[in-house]
């Protein structure tokens, strides 16, 4: 019962995603290309934030002399 409800909820979120991004008008292969590009861009942004954010935070803390 809970699995069916979760599946219905995820289907609703996916439907909303298709409507908001206007992907419902595209063919399946175009939708796949768009989603692949979106996932890769978000993945690269998260990776870049993970790699470089600690360096920037430490530079800010040193600049404001919070950390010596």
UniProtKB/Swiss-Prot annotation:
| Keyword Transcription regulation attributed | no
Membrane-topology annotation of the record: Multi-pass membrane protein
Cytoplasmic-side stretches of the chain, per the record, are: 1-9, 55-68
Q: What is the lineage of its organism?
A: Eukaryota, Metazoa, Chordata, Craniata, Vertebrata
Subunit comment = Component of the serine palmitoyltransferase (SPT) complex, which is composed of SPTLC1, SPTLC2 or SPTLC3 and SPTSSA or SPTSSB. The heterodimer consisting of SPTLC1 and SPTLC2/SPTLC3 forms the catalytic core of the enzyme, while SPTSSA or SPTSSB subunits determine substrate specificity. SPT also interacts with ORMDL proteins, especially ORMDL3, which negatively regulate SPT activity in the presence of ceramides. Interacts with MBOAT7; the interaction plays a role in MBOAT7 localization to mitochondria-associated membranes.
Family, according to the entry, reads as follows: Belongs to the SPTSS family. SPTSSA subfamily.
- What is this protein's name? Serine palmitoyltransferase small subunit A
Annotated site location: Within the serine palmitoyltransferase (SPT) complex, defines the length of the acyl chain-binding pocket, determining the acyl-CoA substrate preference: 25
What's the name of its gene? SPTSSA
Give the source's domain of life in one word: Eukaryota
Q: Which GO terms describe its biological process?
A: ceramide biosynthetic process; protein localization; sphingosine biosynthetic process
Keyword Membrane assigned to the entry: answer is: yes
Instruction: Indicate where this protein is primarily found.
Output: endoplasmic reticulum
